[in-house]
Amino acid sequence: MKLFKLLLTIILTLGLNYNVSAASYKGETAVAGGPPGTIFIAFAAQASKGGVDIEVNAGKTLTKSMLSAGKGDISFYSGVPNLYVLMKNKKAMYSNIEEAPEYADNLRSILGFKAGVFHVLTKENSGISDWKDIKGKKVFLGPPSGAASMGSKGIIKGVTDYDHDKDYEGIILPWGEGLNAFRDNKVDVMVRPCDVGCALVQQFGLNSNFRLLSIPDSALDAPALKKQSSSPGRGITAFEGSVYKGQLTQGTIKALGFNQFIGTTKMVDEDVVYNVTKSFWENLDDIHKTAVFLKEVTKETAFTSVNLPLHKGAYRYYKEAGFSVPENLIPKD
């Protein structure tokens, strides 16, 4: 709740204290309170110190945000490494968009970060204590046309061999509606990508108990799960179940981890991106105060899982500041 209030305060500050002397740029991110939304809102707050106002539109589906950025409809966005590959190769949700590869070529990166894991959770009274118990149940998988719902299906298929349209009822809803459905017991299981220790998950252990399902070692090489864990920006990771109060699974929990990035487009002015990049890193202490998981954002992790070229403005800052930039991220334009 404290994190939500802090994010809301930042959003209101960005909206109400608009600096008329600075140019304004549109930015899109996922729901406030999740990893991409949290860091993006903090990024926008620091950008204003560099004279760049970013109008943050939160609660968006990132598959669509990256498409909007490629078209030039927005200037900044929360990005997913795997979505960049899919867009560039006109696959999955981008398969029917003829211009998808062209839009992908317009995208540029600013910085990467470790985002979190896919939490597969169910309530104590659900009758579900193991993956096999999901059969015949209602499972919230994520939003329409999103990479998260694809990941959720892959995890469950890999562990159980269950299909979402046959062995259990896969529920596709926007993030907020899915969360409410789980809260109101309208779905039995919720798959929620979030940073480890996030308030969105912890709320279910404050007055009752809940259970996180851990990926068993026997499923790690299953094709459906392997497809997800080997995708750009993803991999199997582990954390202690005790990080959450009221969480019933003891010991280490294995989950599908994911990394993301903050991006822009090649159409945005070099000086603008230089200024927002500089403001972010020069105010890193403020970024670290925003959320626990952001303490892992350092100069050494700046390019975590980034798989598309840096914007030339960001690259200019990184060169000046002495960052070690991977060869494949150096812009050619």
Task: Specify the residue positions occupied by each region the protein language model found.
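A structural signal for short loop-to-beta-strand junctions that line the ligand-binding cleft
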Residues: 98-113, 243-253
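Sec-dependent signal peptide recognition
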Residues: 2-9
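Pocket-flanking alpha-helical
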Residues: 38-46, 57-101, 176-182, 196-205, ...
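Bilobed "Venus flytrap"/periplasmic-binding protein-like clamshell domains
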Residues: 23-55, 116-184, 300, 304-313
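C-terminal lobe and pocket-closing loops
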Residues: 213-275
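Sec/Tat signal peptide C-region and signal peptidase I cleavage site
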Residues: 16-22
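An extracytoplasmic/periplasmic, membrane-proximal ligand-sensing/linker region
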Residues: 194-214, 224-227, 259, 268-333
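Ligand-binding pocket segment of bilobal, Venus flytrap-like solute-binding proteins
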Residues: 74-78, 167-230, 315
